[in-house]
Design a protein with these regions (language model features):
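N-terminal Rossmann-like FAD-binding beta1-loop-alpha1 element of flavoenzymes
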Residues: 2-28
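Glycine-rich Rossmann-fold phosphate-binding loop(s) that bind the pyrophosphate
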Residues: 7-9, 31, 36, 258
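Conserved SAM/SAH-binding loop
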Residues: 10, 221-225, 243
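Residues forming the Rossmann-fold NAD(P)(H) cofactor-binding site
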Residues: 13, 205, 263
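Glycine-rich FAD pyrophosphate-binding loop
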Residues: 21-41
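Active-site substrate-recognition segment that forms the wall
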Residues: 43-51, 55-95, 180, 224-235, ...
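Rossmann-like flavin
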Residues: 86-210
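A conserved short coil-to-beta-strand element within the FAD-binding core of flavoproteins
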Residues: 167-176, 196, 217-236
Length: 310
């Protein structure tokens, strides 16, 4: 079967790899000159099953209200007259009920455990290198109430098979000595030793190279204009505009891996994805050979901040 994968980020490239592994003829379309050059380019670098509590939970609503009007808020909402944002916001509120949060944690943990296992298998099969470290992820808290809430969330995750354990402030420093300078400010933490970290951009580029060797056709520098409707919701093809000009690309199946752009592409077909974009900021800092920077990946849940050493 011929499959067109739209988007060459970490999700699209990984999808293309496994499709090729199962015998499909795969073409990948992306507007960038290389794979992994947008959302997958610079992120927190965590393989974090422990980050399984959804943003939509009963405790986030008071926090959002406290953060309203603060430009330095860890989670900043910019409301505007956008029906898509309003619809997404209402669905978000509906998922903040305790029962739904528990159900969603169960689903996220199951998916994340499977995803991490597949990543480990892929690493063993291919020897792919992406600066990965297997030193776990440590969530840290300076607020006692936030620590107590996190301990309850960790308990729920343990019920579903994740090794996330509450730890004292002293234990946080034992796990990551770079925290010694802020030990007196720590209320405690949660540590998941099975979690990992790594460079998503390097992983995606390396896997794209492996996929090309398996016959996957990557068409870079090619814009995706629209999906062309056939009968009903059937897709007759995708209109692309690349170095050779416009072309109607046809396939037996299409994988949409365009992140927050996916709803825009699918909306003309009457398919409405409940996806709304979130923006984060990333800084990459070079380290010297004697740097005392953390070696364990850290998550500051209160400030929505992560640190990973590559």
């Amino acid at each position: 079967m011929r499959v067109a994968v739209l988007g060459a980020g970490v999700v699209g490239t990984t999808s293309a790899w496994y499709l090729a592994q199962t015998g499909h003829d795969v073409v990948v379309i992306d507007r960038q000159p290389v794979a992994g050059n947008e959302t997958s380019f610079a992120n927190g670098g965590q393989i974090s099953v422990s980050h399984a509590e959804p943003w939509a939970n009963p405790h986030v609503l008071p926090a959002v209200l406290r953060w309203l009007g603060r430009e330095d808020a860890p989670l900043l909402w910019r409301w505007r007259a956008d029906p898509a944002q309003l619809a997404w916001g209402l669905r978000f509120l509906g998922e903040c009920l305790p029962g739904r949060t528990r159900r969603n944690i169960r689903a996220i943990v199951a998916l994340a455990l499977y995803s991490r296992a597949r990543l480990q298998a892929l690493r063993g099969e291919t020897g792919i290198a992406y600066d990965h470290l297997e030193r776990g992820i440590l969530h840290i808290y300076t607020d006692r109430a936030a620590y107590v809430h996190a301990a309850a969330a960790a308990r729920t995750m343990r019920e579903f098979g994740l090794d996330r354990e509450p730890v004292s402030a002293a234990r946080c420093v034992e796990i990551e000595p770079a925290l010694a300078a802020v030990r007196d400010r720590l209320a405690g933490g949660d540590y998941t030793p099975s979690d990992e970290s790594g460079d998503a951009h390097r992983f995606t580029r390396a896997l794209a190279d492996l996929a090309v060797a398996r016959g996957v056709d990557f068409r870079y520098g090619t814009r995706i204009e629209k999906l062309v409707r056939g009968g009903g919701r059937h897709v007759a093809g995708v209109l692309i505009d690349g170095p050779g000009g416009q072309e109607l690309l046809t396939a037996d199946a299409y994988v949409i891996a365009l992140g927050s752009y996916s709803p825009l592409l699918l909306r003309p077909l009457g398919i409405r994805l409940p996806v709304y974009p979130a923006k984060g900021y990333s800084a990459t800092i070079p380290l010297g050979p004697d740097s005392q920077a953390p070696t364990v990946s850290l998550t500051d849940d209160e400030r929505r901040l992560v640190i990973s050493r590559l």
